[in-house]
Curated annotation (Swiss-Prot):
Source taxonomy: Bacteria, Pseudomonadati, Pseudomonadota, Gammaproteobacteria, Pseudomonadales
Protein keywords: Protein biosynthesis, Transferase
Database matches in HAMAP family: Formyl_trans (MF_00182)
Reaction equation(s) it catalyzes: L-methionyl-tRNA(fMet) + (6R)-10-formyltetrahydrofolate = N-formyl-L-methionyl-tRNA(fMet) + (6S)-5,6,7,8-tetrahydrofolate + H(+)
Entry keyword Transferase: yes
InterPro entries, A to Z: Fmt, Formyl_trans_C, Formyl_trans_C_sf, Formyl_transf_N, Formyl_transf_N_sf, Formyl_transferase-like_C_sf, GART_AS, Met-tRNA-FMT_C
Entry-linked CDD domains: FMT_core_Met-tRNA-FMT_N (cd08646), Met_tRNA_FMT_C (cd08704)
Gene Ontology terms, MF aspect: methionyl-tRNA formyltransferase activity
List of residues binding (6S)-5,6,7,8-tetrahydrofolate: 113-116
Entry similarity comment: Belongs to the Fmt family.
Protein's gene: fmt
Record-given protein name: Methionyl-tRNA formyltransferase
Role noted for this protein: Attaches a formyl group to the free amino group of methionyl-tRNA(fMet). The formyl group appears to play a dual role in the initiator identity of N-formylmethionyl-tRNA by promoting its recognition by IF2 and preventing the misappropriation of this tRNA by the elongation apparatus.
NCBIfam families: fmt
Amino acid sequence: MTEPLRIVFAGTPEFAAEHLKALLDSPHQIVAVYTQPDRPAGRGQKLMPSPVKQLALQHDVPVMQPPTLRDPAAQAELAALQPDLMVVVAYGLILPQVVLDIPRLGCINSHASLLPRWRGAAPIQRAVQAGDAESGVTVMRMEAGLDTGPMLLKAVTPITAQDTGGTLHDRLAELGPPAVLQAIAGLADGTLVGEVQDDSLANYAHKLNKDEARLDWTRPADELERLVRAFNPWPICHSTLNEETLKVLAADLAEGQGAPGTILGASKDGLIVACGQNALRLTRLQLPGGKPLNFTDLFNSRREKFAIGTVLGQ
């Protein structure tokens, strides 16, 4: 085995924390962790540290939280660490070329898609939304472009018909860390050569926003079913029922035709709603002030709210 490396890790959410755990358990020395500044969260809007920061502090690793890495002082601070390698996972800040050039072996990134497909901010959800048959993690050498660098390793997993954004996220968070460790070993001993991405196959995974989560019942049912899965656990698809917000956490395809948004049927199996093509059976819902419930429970207690002919989304 090659000598342990001096590694700087940069990441922010739970997906990144899983990678940091693996690195902390490896022979390599994590000399510092970079993560986003603490953000307000929860009802009290209290400043909360990122999952990566919390993990780093538990292991007594120095934590850096510069608002930008374009600042010469922040760049000098990073250079003073004399890293062999920088590992970046869902960090959320742009790394300018001067930063990419600091580590002796450069910077690598674990990206939650099979590049060049789904470059960008929300690759997991976009893969589910599009109905892709598979997803995975790509470990790449970073360059100035967004997720454009040479690919070092890929780990692949099927996307099932039951996968949500959440379940696929968790599976990729397990696939990524061993792939990163394998890539580090290959870079350290000089055996790993990157594969240039074919830009003609690239597409962009735009950041999620809550407006997209509003169900447009004029769309085909299969498209909406994938959207419901992709946007669980965030931002959660929703519609309105009698001017109240109705969150839709799970749904499957059903037979039926009618004006889009019209309730065609309600039973313990679910609430059947007409779409632009075919129908959707809503199986897990959340009403204002309530908790998420299977439709069976809502049907038993709130049956009157779901009268046939009622139109959602008005």
